[in-house]
């Protein structure tokens, strides 16, 4: 995971932690989950390509991390992160 770079809006990160109980720092770990499931998310932005990652945090919580890629794919911008719901847990490859 050391080659991955992350960025986010600090205000959004604070709001996300309050609302969902998931820090963006914790969400970074989902990107190192070898079983992570990457899903295209074309419906939520016309300006940029967005993606949803289902992946495990270091504390083994299954997270849903909405993100996009910046700087020609060299930077991952985290937009939101939350715990997966029952339907999302059912599609996660274990």
Show which residues each predicted segment covers.
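Ribonuclease/tRNase effector modules and their secretory precursors
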Residues: 1-94
């Amino acid at each position: 995971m050391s080659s991955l770079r992350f960025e986010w809006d600090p205000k959004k990160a604070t709001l996300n932690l309050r609302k969902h109980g998931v820090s963006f720092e914790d969400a970074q770990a989902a990107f190192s989950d070898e079983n992570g499931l990457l899903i295209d998310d074309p419906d939520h932005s016309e300006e940029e390509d967005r993606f949803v990652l289902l992946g495990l945090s270091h504390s083994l919580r299954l997270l849903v991390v909405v993100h996009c890629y910046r700087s020609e794919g060299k930077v991952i911008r985290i937009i939101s992160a939350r715990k997966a719901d029952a339907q999302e847990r059912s599609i996660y490859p274990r």
